[in-house]
Amino acid sequence: MQHFKKNEIKPHLNKYWKIPPDQNASFVAAMEDILEVYARPYNVKFPVVCMDESSVQLIGEVHEPIPAAPGHPVLVDDEYVRKGVASIFMEVEALGGRRKVKITERRTRIDWAHFIKEMLEERYADAEKVVLVMDNLNTHNTASLYTAFPPDEARYLAERLEIHYTPKHGSWLDIAEIELSVLKRQCLAGRIDCIEKMRAEVAAWNTDRNNRQTKVDWQFTTKDARIKLKRLYPKF
């Protein structure tokens, strides 16, 4: 019988991970499609742009933090007050080394559609098509453009998109989700109590990352996937 040391097993703790099932043709088909997109050379007329969105809690202080002193960090009371929720839209052009973050009060079809319109008309006005990588959230489709804009405008915007969806359980394939994690860790780890303050702090982070031209060097290829993720492929 195997014996475990005290505290070695912690059944009250869970770590969640999205695990695709074995021999999943749908997963590997969508995965290889994304990996093919990431393998394309940089083309200013057909930029590859990844997008993701998330919600973040606005948190206020019950008691003012005590400032840092020599030998002592800032002291923050463990009590807090919830101030609502803000939504984050993240757009990343990995090879171009630029991103755009927008903070909104909601994450509806309308909000997504306006984010896409701004992307196409303001940031990529000279591109023939934007190659857009994202997950298949129910708002992430051209129907949202028709919900937000007249048919002629919606069609025009839709025709400037080449959409590629990451597979279910494949969020790690979306570079924007990786960048969103960086944003949360570097900029949103502390308590922020209002959307205006969040917008200001995120804008400063966004500008700094773009000024540094921080690029993403994606190296995982289809060849790698067929070896390292062999169990996900149907067997013959």
What are these regions (language model features)?
Residues 86, 135-136, 163-184, 196:
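RNase H-like two-metal-ion nuclease catalytic core shared by retroviral integrases
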Residues 1-82:
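Charge-mixed, compositionally biased segments that are often intrinsically disordered regulatory tracts
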Residues 22, 62, 197-236:
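C-terminal domain-tail junction helix/linker
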Residues 50-52, 91, 97, 116, ...:
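Mobile genetic element proteins and their domesticated derivatives, centered on retroelements
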Residues 99, 176-194, 208-212:
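Active-site proximal helix-loop segment of RNase H-like, two-metal nucleases, encompassing DDE(D)
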Residues 127-141:
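Acidic/histidine-rich, metal-coordinating catalytic segments
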Residues 69-128:
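Electropositive, glycine- and tryptophan-enriched low-complexity nucleic-acid-binding patches
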Residues 74-80, 154-175, 191-194:
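RNase H-like polynucleotidyl transferase catalytic core
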